């Protein structure tokens, strides 16, 4: 009975949902033209004045919606960035007091697409994956936004392929050496030479 009550839905190539088989392009234009004066709510864009020979790039700040992120004491911030930006990001994280970072070499592709390598004059593009670096940082809830903004500031070039940041809730943190859990295990104490 439930199957007979549902309406067929088609997804068009433009991503609109409709109970019609086809959507005319003019329908899409009229929908989109209604949004021409709106401002994206997900980004704060402010232009940054150029320093030296650098280009003018807008300052991008990720905004968080309390409904969007599940409530948790700890969060893991995973950032996939360009390998040659890792030093800038790591230094910036140290300046804001973040000392516990795990870094892994990864490969993948997104909007940037894959790359083609040249060896001996021949082109090879077996898997089209691009080398990136994944940074994993577990922080308390009140540190998430500053970590995200620091990563964006350090990793951003303004070009396709700058990377992605993922934020995941973490249910618990356990320090292997002592068995401590929660905030005691997450907290990094002492100087860089003394273990915590």
UniProtKB/Swiss-Prot annotation:
Binding site residues for ATP: 108-112, 161-164
Superkingdom as given in the UniProt entry: Eukaryota
A GO CC annotation given for this chain: cytosol
Keywords from the named record: ATP-binding, Chloroplast, Magnesium, Metal-binding, Nucleotide-binding, Plastid, Transcription, Transcription regulation, Transit peptide
InterPro entries xref list: N-reg_PII, N-reg_PII-like_a/b, N-reg_PII/ATP_PRibTrfase_C, N-reg_PII_CS
A GO term for molecular function: magnesium ion binding
Induction cue: By light and sucrose. Down-regulated by treatment with amino acids.
Gene3D superfamilies in the record: 3.30.70.120
Phenotype caused by lack of the gene: No visible phenotype under normal growth condition, but increased sensitivity to elevated levels of nitrite.
Residues at which Mg(2+) binds: 110
Gene Ontology biological-process annotations: anthocyanin-containing compound biosynthetic process; regulation of arginine biosynthetic process via ornithine; regulation of fatty acid biosynthetic process; regulation of nitrogen utilization; response to light stimulus; response to sucrose
Transit peptide: 1-61
Pfam families membership: P-II
Subcellular location: Plastid, Chloroplast
Role: Participates in sensing carbon and organic nitrogen status and regulates some steps of primary carbon and nitrogen metabolism. Required for nitrite uptake in chloroplasts and regulates arginine biosynthesis through interaction with acetylglutamate kinase (NAGK) in chloroplasts. Regulates fatty acids synthesis in chloroplasts by interacting with the acetyl-CoA carboxylase complex and inhibiting acetyl-CoA carboxylase (ACCase) activity.
Assembly behavior: Homodimer. Interacts with NAGK. Interaction with NAGK is dependent of MgATP and inhibited by 2-oxoglutarate, arginine, glutamate, citrate, and oxaloacetate.
Family: Belongs to the P(II) protein family.
Name this protein carries in UniProt: Nitrogen regulatory protein P-II homolog
């Amino acid at each position: 009975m439930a199957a007979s009550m549902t309406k067929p839905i088609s997804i068009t190539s433009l991503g609109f949902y409709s109970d019609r088989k086809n959507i005319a392009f003019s329908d899409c234009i009229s929908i989109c033209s209604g949004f021409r004066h709106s401002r994206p709510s997900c980004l704060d864009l402010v232009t940054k004045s150029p320093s030296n020979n650098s280009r003018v790039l807008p300052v991008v700040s990720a905004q968080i919606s309390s409904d969007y992120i599940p409530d948790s004491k700890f969060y893991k911030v995973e950032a996939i960035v360009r390998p040659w930006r890792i030093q800038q990001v790591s230094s910036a994280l140290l300046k804001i007091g973040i000392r516990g970072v795990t870094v892994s070499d990864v490969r993948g592709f997104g909007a940037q697409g894959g790359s083609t390598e040249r060896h001996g004059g021949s082109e090879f593009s077996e898997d089209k994956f691009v080398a990136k670096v994944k940074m994993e940082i577990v922080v308390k809830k009140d540190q998430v936004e500053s970590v995200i903004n620091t990563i964006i500031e350090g990793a951003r070039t303004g070009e396709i392929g700058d990377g992605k940041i993922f934020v995941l809730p973490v249910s618990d943190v356990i320090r292997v050496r002592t068995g401590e859990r929660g905030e005691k295990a997450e907290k990094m104490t002492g100087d860089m030479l003394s273990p915590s």
